[in-house]
């Protein structure tokens, strides 16, 4: 940090002398008002992956608030660096108090345009509901369409009312299809009671499915965030890593033959979580090998690091030869790292839609100024030096759940993506895949995977926006605390 102090002081002294030469000496005032932005710039000049693309800014920009100044420094190649502002109460308590509990109604949703194309309104479709949450007690469930909030249409400005508050009234309505039309059915009004502080456990569903055809035991895990513990900004809290060991030990005790890792709603988190999970999924013969390595900018090659499979998790290893991964439009960073890092060792089949494409790592930089920075600091490679997924991974079997009308609950074997993955394991094909020879054939049991008819127009869910209960704003692999 001495190097940074020297940089800041030299810059400030030069500018202060200029101010003093104009008459009144306002050096102290200038230093105080620009100190924060100079601190940010110093950090970025040192560790940022694209430090040589940081622009030279005019003096006036150093008076901007931190959350406005930080984006000015970013490269045009950078889609993922961000800054998280903390309120005074949170900052004074230290980072360990951040997001311990989420005060929420307990619904994760996606915003979309009107799938019937009969209005210009937006609608929210529920992706899942947290157990024992206010939304669950109100009777909301996965797949429900929310048409209004407090008797008002949903917009980009008011959808936050679905996340938290002292209670909210929503209406839900089904979509009625005929051979020629799609229309909204009769609406039902539902009152959700006040939001509650809830633990958002990343292990949403953990099940063992026994195939009625072959008798195979198939492990199924819906994992929603690579977070070490109940305090996401504190990697020293490892409570969820310990729970991960318990979850996989159960899979091992049951002798699972195949494994389905559902990452459709997981957009990343800490690399040590991905390292731990990969250790438990990989073939046992690979456990002395490399998991991934990070390459930093040319000034900070000292930070380059190779992650091996973690021996602390080897006793829970399932010794798999093949892994089935379910992906969605939010599957990113550490989720993609799992795919990329395991492919040199085993057959990884991807079913779902194109992933986001985050082959870079961020570093968490805690500041003394009530914010945390997450700049991109490294490119992530697997053991074969491959990192060519900046545009995302294309699935082996493409199925977009947003194109379908009827959704079963996650973990239900009739649920679209799970059904197709189970069919792939048993019969070698995914019936509903757009890029499969069997596309358009058998569908997933009863109404669980009934396709929307051709006139059902929500085949692109526009203006997608997640609620905040799973902290979907975290955009990249979090490598280290700095």
Listing of model-derived features with the role each one plays in the protein:
Residues 221, 225-236, 251-258, 267-482:
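C-terminal "post-core" interaction segments
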Residues 23-258, 449-482:
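Flexible, low-complexity junctional segments that flank or bridge functional domains
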Residues 10, 28, 330:
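Conserved aromatic-histidine-acidic binding/catalytic patches
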Residues 18-21:
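C-terminal motif of bacterial Sec signal peptides marking the signal peptidase cleavage site
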Residues 1-11:
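Bacterial N-terminal signal peptides that target proteins for export
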Residues 264:
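Short strand-turn motif at the edge of the Rossmann-like AdoMet-binding core
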Residues 261:
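P-loop NTPase catalytic core of nucleic-acid-dependent motor ATPases
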